[in-house]
């Protein structure tokens, strides 16, 4: 794979203009360009009123070795693709299904990866599913009546669901986790430009659908969700979690992905 950086085009421009610029930068014929993927897009406004987009693009071409041998300048380089790899499985048999506490970003992605690997996770969420949660949030804005467990902080999708779905990217993530997260969001309905724009965000309306589709995929893979299920105690000797003060759920392995607002759960764990 070849990476081309500092590719500047005026705004607006077409896809065809970007491809022509790539071909010129690489000194190849159009038919030698097999495919390309935008990795980064940033705005250059230093020469106002002129505005430019500056791109970093990963390219597949014919005769890559020959091109790299004769390349000129530092804006064309060779890179190795590093897709995210799930850590190796353990050697001991898992006692029961894994239980995940919380269905914010950490909990959802934990459940998604475990479900893909065949572990059929159970997700416990103190709030409501994202559809009911949206209704509760709308009701709060209209009436001022707060549902303490289903609001902008608690419920499926986590606190970011109602903050426009802004994303922070880990530029130096060598394990490909950041790319995996963004590609997963795109898979479930987010706009493809979150993969490369400088300040990506999904948008609350779209994120609600993305979260719902992630849940549906986890369910399809054998996972389970239990909403309005607050973990109220950790019963270590019994290998159980107490839910809503009464119910006991077996949990040989439990992942607490409770975000920053579940202060009562922090106190219970302490």
Describe each region flagged by the PLM:
Residues 1-53, 57-270:
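Residues forming the flavin
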